[in-house]
Structure formats: C-alpha cells, structure tokens
C-alpha cells in the first residue's frame, strides 16, 4: 500500500507557506499566534 505522505516542496509551500498565511485574515491570526508563542519557524 502507498503511504499517504508523499513530500513535495512546491505543494508544501503553496498550502502552508508564509505568503499563503499572509493572504487571509485567519492565516495572519495563525502567524500572530505563533509569534506570540515564540516559535522559531512561523510558516513552512
């Protein structure tokens, strides 16, 4: 059986990247929450 996670840098960036997060209000909320928590990496 094929595994569900087949990594692709392009797909990863397009769905979870910084630019995508910044595009929507909810995404910006995610970034702000991660900043408040002190995350080293904000987005993929």
From Swiss-Prot:
GO terms for biological process: translation. Keywords: Ribonucleoprotein, Ribosomal protein. Disulfide bonds: none annotated. It holds the Pfam family Ribosomal_L34. InterPro entries: Ribosomal_bL34, Ribosomal_bL34_CS. It comes from the Bacteria. GO terms for cellular component: ribonucleoprotein complex; ribosome. One of its GO terms (molecular function) is structural constituent of ribosome. Belongs to the bacterial ribosomal protein bL34 family. PANTHER family: LARGE RIBOSOMAL SUBUNIT PROTEIN BL34M, MITOCHONDRIAL RIBOSOMAL PROTEIN 34 FAMILY MEMBER. This is Large ribosomal subunit protein bL34. It comes from Herminiimonas arsenicoxydans.
């Amino acid at each position: 059986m094929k595994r569900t996670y087949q990594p692709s840098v392009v797909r990863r960036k397009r769905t979870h990247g910084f630019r995508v997060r910044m595009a929507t209000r909810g995404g910006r909320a995610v970034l702000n929450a991660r900043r408040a928590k002190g995350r080293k990496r904000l987005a993929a």
